[in-house]
């Protein structure tokens, strides 16, 4: 199907295989759009994130933008979180049953964590409505713990986190916010953590 070709084109540099349920759900998000349209949206998003990240701006607002973002970024994000979590768990002797995915986006970190941990409860915090809708739609296609995940609309830079979890994951979040807001957010992440705080950021000169 052409949707699969689009995914391969948009994610050609990201070789991490996604779970079948997630990959299938991702394909459904772009049904009805032509490959040229998706490539244009992907390029616009890439330019926007490259040039405007780090100021706390809203970088996408449409559901199709969030869907394309998921297609482009989820394989790499899923892979990065999977590797970081796997490595961290080698040095961890506690028990993890609850997850808080902060700045969850389309939920890649949650899917990666669920693949390695016996999670019983998942909470996702995401500011952007389009991202929340896409993330929820994707998780509805997953296992019960994913489909029953609780999604919270909140701006991390201005609101305290009012829930806690055994593991708190923040992936590709800190670098997108203004520097002045990072300490406040970090303090809140740590306060919400019962056992492990995992922060994943891009390994670039401009990264956090």
Which residues does each predicted region cover?
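N-terminal auxiliary segments of SAM/dcSAM-dependent transferases
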Residues: 10-56
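S-adenosyl-L-methionine
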Residues: 136-161
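Conserved beta-strand signature within the Rossmann-like core of class I S-adenosyl-L-methionine
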Residues: 194-203
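Conserved SAM/SAH-binding beta-strand->alpha-helix loop
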Residues: 128
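Conserved SAM-binding loop of SAM-dependent methyltransferases across substrates and taxa
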Residues: 106-119
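A short SAM/SAH-binding and catalytic strip from SAM-dependent methyltransferases
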Residues: 166-180
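Conserved class I S-adenosyl-L-methionine
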Residues: 95-105
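Class I SAM-dependent methyltransferase Rossmann-like catalytic core
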Residues: 57, 61-83
